[in-house]
Regions:
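Membrane-interface micro-motifs in multi-pass membrane enzymes
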Residues: 74, 119-120, 124-162, 189, ...
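Signature aromatic-anchored transmembrane alpha helix within multi-pass, membrane-resident enzymes
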Residues: 174-175, 336-360
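Membrane-interface transmembrane helices that cradle and orient dolichyl/undecaprenyl
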Residues: 154-174, 210
């Protein structure tokens, strides 16, 4: 018995040692990660005008109310605001590392209930090699609250739901605590919580004998949390505006684009393909006995596929839950073999640990470069005059471990007003090299410009111009005009842009065969004139819509200025 206890203690020591080492490495990566644009957004009351810093808990309540109405209803963003406005990045680094340790242990528990070092080692390997953009889903303050924290809470909730003790009668206090915890976990982030809800409902539908009264109560409370997020006016507003997915496409194109996006976003993750192949093999194998895979791991993976097909999102971040449940399904399938063969288990542990360090040098190099860039840009903004116009730095080499701040206003300009509020500036923009050369030149910006054949609906933005060797459209605007930072362009014949039938089919399946697209804009003042900068306009653009904020001057006729291409031009 003494020998068995020593062996058990050694195994547990290895398990917690791997978790501890992985957490220390993760803490170092957290320290290298800087504050990002969205983190600055949460330093201010959402949708306040002018932007007002968050200073009290009442400010947080007002901010989250506004956020629910205009953006989304995720509880995860409350955590992001508390860290960004009060606790600070250093406290977040420690808290995020603790959540990461919980994440590793919870994922390991879903793979196998045995406390063996191989499972946290494999989970750490998954994070380093396969997790979608860990710099955005696990290290970035706002992103980690939305994805890693959300999934960690939901994994803990799902494990509690599967605990045999729930089959017995619970006290009213215990039920109350479970309801509150379920609602909170369900309202974190819809791409995570909708997946977990669907997966657990599917599991208990296939295993009805385990669906006790307490389980049904917890599922209902968790579903209420998910519904709170999905029912937020802000979420529906984003959907109506086409912010997250195109809406002006046919039903067939919508369906094909979702399948295409799922397949395309799963390619860098790899694991969804492997898990799907294994699942198909299991289904074929058990078809004769009519015993389909009904484990919670299989149900959660299937649910993740369905939810991603429904949402049809194009960014990598929302696929974090799908990647994690793909890993869990594959590792769980191999767990019985690993548990029964010590030599294989030890070899797998060593291999997983070694593979964890393969991407580390490149990741650390990219993170250090990004940190130096962020610090240099911050110093430049602080030392700049009220109108801060800086040259856009060279685009960094893409890295899964770095959330890019996008210091190029032609690519993204939504952080400008928050930089202004944080650093006390009237304008902050980062100009591409061709525009910056014009800005620093003593000659007028439009001295050799060519006026484009568009008629404007408003004298506040009377005309559009093109400049030689400059990839932009220049629109002189009234200094009192406040734009939203977006413009829409209508394409007269989008099919004509396709150079071949294959390209047209490809655009159709990708959901990009749309005749109306939104673009980022930015503005600056040069020699006393304010200019709005738009992307270059091609001859097939027959209408440009410049979107104006509602508090524009009362003399302006509408909240959109339209430039219409002249007939025959």
């Amino acid at each position: 018995m003494s020998c068995l206890n020593k062996i058990s203690a050694t195994r547990h020591l290895g398990y917690f040692s791997v978790v501890a080492v992985a957490s220390l490495v993760f803490l170092a990566l957290n320290v290298l990660t800087t504050i990002k644009g969205d983190d600055i957004i949460y330093m201010f009351i959402s949708d306040s005008s002018p932007l007002t810093p968050v200073r009290t808990l009442h400010d947080v309540a007002v901010s989250m109310h506004n956020h629910y109405l205009t953006t989304n209803g995720r509880l995860a963003n409350l955590l992001a605001q508390l860290f960004a406005a009060f606790a600070g990045k250093s406290v977040f680094n420690v808290a995020n590392t603790m959540v990461f340790a919980m994440f590793i242990m919870l994922v390991s528990q879903f793979v196998s209930r045995k406390l063996l070092a191989v499972y946290p080692a494999l989970t750490a390997m998954f994070v380093m090699l396969f997790a979608p953009v860990p710099g955005e889903t696990m290290l970035w303050l706002t992103g980690s609250c939305n994805y890693m924290w959300s999934l960690t809470m939901s994994l803990a909730w799902a494990l509690a739901l599967l605990h045999p003790r729930l089959a017995s009668r619970q006290s009213p206090l215990h039920i109350t605590l479970l309801i509150v915890a379920s609602v909170l976990a369900g309202s974190m982030n819809e791409s995570v919580t909708a997946t977990v809800l669907l997966g657990m409902v599917l599991f208990f539908a296939l295993n009805r004998q385990r669906a006790s009264r307490t389980v049904i109560i917890m599922l209902t409370a968790y579903a209420a949390g998910v519904a709170l997020v999905l029912a937020s006016p802000g979420a529906w507003l984003r959907f109506a505006n086409g912010s997250d997915m195109p809406k002006d496409i046919s039903l067939l194109q919508m369906l094909t684009s979702r399948v295409t996006r799922l397949l395309r976003q799963s390619q860098p993750i790899v694991l969804p393909y492997a898990a799907a192949a294994y699942g198909c093999w299991r289904i074929v194998r058990h078809r004769r006995s009519k015993q389909l895979p009904t484990s919670p791991q299989a149900c959660l993976f299937a649910a993740a596929i369905v939810v991603m097909l429904i949402f049809g999102l194009n960014a990598q971040r929302p696929y974090f839950a799908l990647a994690t449940f793909s890993f869990i399904a594959i590792a769980h399938a191999a767990a019985q073999t690993i548990n029964s063969r010590p030599a294989l288990r030890h070899a797998t542990t060593v291999a997983a640990v070694v593979l964890c360090f393969v991407p580390m040098p490149a990741a650390i190099s990219s993170m250090i470069t990004a940190r130096f860039t962020d610090e240099a840009v911050t110093r430049a903004i602080k030392s700049a005059p009220a109108q801060c116009v800086l040259p856009a730095p060279s685009a960094p080499k893409p890295s899964r471990f770095v959330m890019d701040n996008i210091y190029n206003s032609a690519h993204y300009h939504s952080y400008a007003e928050f930089y202004c509020a944080l650093y006390g500036k009237s304008n902050v923009c980062f100009l591409p090299s061709d525009i910056y050369a014009r800005y620093t030149s003593p000659t007028p910006l439009l001295h050799d410009a060519v006026q484009l054949p568009y008629d404007s609906s408003d004298t506040a933005a009377p005309a559009a111009y093109a400049l030689p060797n400059v990839q932009a459209t220049i629109v002189p605007i009234s200094p009192q005009l406040t734009t939203t930072g977006f413009a829409g362009m209508h394409i007269a014949n989008v099919e004509a842009r396709c150079t071949s039938r294959w390209q047209q089919i490809k655009m159709f399946f990708y959901g990009s065969l749309s005749d109306y697209r939104n673009y980022y804009t930015y503005h600056f003042t040069h020699q006393g004139t304010t200019y709005l900068i738009l992307p270059p306009v091609s001859p097939d653009i027959d209408r440009i819509d410049i979107f104006i904020k509602p508090h524009r001057p009362a003399s302006a006729p509408s909240d959109t200025i339209t430039l219409t291409r002249l007939t025959g031009k």
